[in-house]
């Protein structure tokens, strides 16, 4: 795989040739309901300093998350492990693509240290895709979970994983480490995979989530999608059914925002009332929790949502017992 610089936006960020050679797409003006404040608070600065001092990477920065100001002000951050270079070139994603560096053996300890420094009660850990590794990075995920458990036993752990495609036994390694929440995003409906997520397979991702529940039914499972990529409403409803058939507990739905002209265009901006309807429908389909709004992202309000998940499961068990 060759790594090139995308000089079109003069950012100096590493890009896979496929991204650099894509035709420019118009970037639509965002509607008023997607406006966010610039990150300038004291809490934001303190979080950034902790991240920098521990030489950590966050998906908040790498993916250009619109909620970074709100989350970092509250000293919430989603740590991205195994480097900042991904082996895939998804059309929606702003993370750099190329040949990754070797794993940092000190990363589990550094993540655990940051969790303790920030006083996190709930931490979200994600990663780039590492197709170059024999286990896809599963063992490294497990080591990070173990380190956080030892440093901050009271902190609940949520992971957002790649699909471990063609990595036999990888999922079992991660599940054995017993995260509290296992998140793997479908990202979009199956008809859009060839253009949006060409390196992945929709039904493999569904099966991955189902397998987590088979291995350990106590782990909460979660998945998210973006809308505004040209999908049809009935495709979203079918995707919900697919997730429920895999016994997924929690679904997130947010608006796709185009990072640069080289990325997949926004086909439309979905209005807030339509997001609300997805939330209502999702709950009737049996999800314990559905978060659906223009600015919803996988890790947004993750700590609060974990508390809601626990309460919803307890209420469900109580209703079955009565």
Swiss-Prot record:
Catalytic activity of the protein: [[Fe-S] cluster scaffold protein carrying a second [4Fe-4S](2+) cluster] + N(6)-octanoyl-L-lysyl-[protein] + 2 oxidized [2Fe-2S]-[ferredoxin] + 2 S-adenosyl-L-methionine + 4 H(+) = [[Fe-S] cluster scaffold protein] + N(6)-[(R)-dihydrolipoyl]-L-lysyl-[protein] + 4 Fe(3+) + 2 hydrogen sulfide + 2 5'-deoxyadenosine + 2 L-methionine + 2 reduced [2Fe-2S]-[ferredoxin]
UniProt xrefs under CDD domains: Radical_SAM (cd01335)
Cofactor binding note from Swiss-Prot or TrEMBL: Binds 2 [4Fe-4S] clusters per subunit. One cluster is coordinated with 3 cysteines and an exchangeable S-adenosyl-L-methionine.
Residues that, per the record, bind [4Fe-4S] cluster 1: 60, 65, 71, 299
Residues in Radical SAM core domain copies: 72-288
GO molecular function, one term: lipoate synthase activity
Positions contributing to [4Fe-4S] cluster 2 binding: 86, 90, 93
Gene Ontology cellular-component annotations: cytoplasm
Top-level class of the enzyme under EC nomenclature: transferase
Positions of region (Disordered): 1-22
UniProt keyword list: 4Fe-4S, Cytoplasm, Iron, Iron-sulfur, Metal-binding, S-adenosyl-L-methionine, Transferase
Residue ranges, compositional bias (Polar residues): 1-12
Family: Belongs to the radical SAM superfamily. Lipoyl synthase family.
Protein name (Swiss-Prot/TrEMBL): Lipoyl synthase
Organism from which the protein derives: Brucella canis (strain ATCC 23365 / NCTC 10854 / RM-666)
């Amino acid at each position: 795989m060759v790594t090139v610089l995308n000089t079109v936006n003069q950012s100096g960020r590493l890009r896979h040739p496929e991204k650099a050679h894509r035709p420019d797409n118009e970037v639509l003006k965002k509607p008023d309901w997607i406006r966010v404040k610039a990150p300038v608070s004291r809490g934001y600065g303190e979080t950034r300093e902790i991240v920098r001092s521990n030489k950590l990477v966050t998906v908040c920065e790498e993916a250009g998350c619109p909620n970074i100001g709100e989350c970092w002000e509250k000293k919430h951050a989603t740590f991205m492990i195994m480097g900042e270079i991904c082996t895939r070139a998804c059309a929606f994603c702003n993370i750099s693509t190329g040949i990754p560096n070797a794993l940092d053996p000190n990363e589990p300890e550094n993540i655990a240290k940051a969790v303790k420094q920030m006083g996190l009660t709930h931490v979200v850990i994600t990663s780039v895709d590492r197709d170059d590794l024999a286990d896809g990075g599963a063992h490294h995920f497990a080591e990070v979970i173990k380190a956080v458990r030892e440093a901050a036993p009271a902190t609940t752990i949520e992971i957002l994983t790649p699909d471990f495609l063609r990595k036999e036994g990888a999922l079992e390694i991660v599940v054995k480490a017993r995260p509290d929440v296992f998140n793997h995003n479908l990202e979009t409906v199956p008809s859009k995979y060839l253009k949006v997520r060409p390196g992945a397979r929709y039904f493999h991702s569904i099966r991955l989530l189902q397998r987590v529940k088979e291995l350990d039914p106590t782990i909460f499972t979660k998945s998210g999608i973006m809308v505004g990529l040209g999908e049809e409403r009935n495709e979203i409803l079918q995707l919900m059914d697919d997730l429920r058939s895999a016994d997924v507990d929690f679904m997130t739905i947010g608006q796709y925002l185009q990072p640069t002209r080289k990325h997949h265009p926004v086909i439309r901006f979905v209005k807030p009332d339509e997001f609300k309807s997805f939330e209502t429908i999702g709950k009737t389909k049996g999800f314990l929790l559905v978060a659906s709004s223009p600015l919803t992202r996988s890790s947004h309000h993750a700590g609060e949502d974990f508390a809601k998940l626990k309460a919803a499961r307890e209420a469900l068990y109580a209703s079955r017992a009565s």
